[in-house]
Amino acid sequence: MLNTFSLIGICLNSTLFSSSFFFGKLPEAYAFLNPIVDIMPVIPLFFFLLAFVWQAAVSFR
């Protein structure tokens, strides 16, 4: 049980300190990719929603 809480604490701690990483800027040569990079974190959610749509299409067998 303690190991689980330790792991959760480590994960939360690392996300708090790496939050500045998420707000970093791309190098100037890749500035045209900014709109794509902004959308990229949402892409896994589309797959998650697709699973529900697929199950609804096959009537949740």
UniProtKB/Swiss-Prot annotation:
Top-level taxon of origin: Eukaryota
Mind listing the UniProt keywords for this protein, alphabetically? Answer: Chloroplast, Membrane, Photosynthesis, Photosystem II, Plastid, Reaction center, Thylakoid, Transmembrane, Transmembrane helix
Protein's membrane topology: Single-pass membrane protein
User: Where, by residue number, does the polypeptide cross the bilayer?
Assistant: 36-56
| Any single biological process term in GO | photosynthesis
Q: Name one GO cellular component term.
A: chloroplast thylakoid membrane
Q: Where in the cell is it found?
A: Plastid, Chloroplast thylakoid membrane
Which SUPFAM superfamilies does the entry link to? Photosystem II reaction center protein K, PsbK
* Propeptide cleavage-removed residue intervals: 1-24
Q: Name one Pfam family in it.
A: PsbK
As for family, the record states:
Belongs to the PsbK family.
Q: How does it assemble?
A: PSII is composed of 1 copy each of membrane proteins PsbA, PsbB, PsbC, PsbD, PsbE, PsbF, PsbH, PsbI, PsbJ, PsbK, PsbL, PsbM, PsbT, PsbX, PsbY, PsbZ, Psb30/Ycf12, at least 3 peripheral proteins of the oxygen-evolving complex and a large number of cofactors. It forms dimeric complexes.
Q: What does this chain do? A: One of the components of the core complex of photosystem II (PSII). PSII is a light-driven water:plastoquinone oxidoreductase that uses light energy to abstract electrons from H(2)O, generating O(2) and a proton gradient subsequently used for ATP formation. It consists of a core antenna complex that captures photons, and an electron transfer chain that converts photonic excitation into a charge separation.
Q: Write the protein's name.
A: Photosystem II reaction center protein K
UniProt source species: Nicotiana tabacum
Q: Gene symbol?
A: psbK
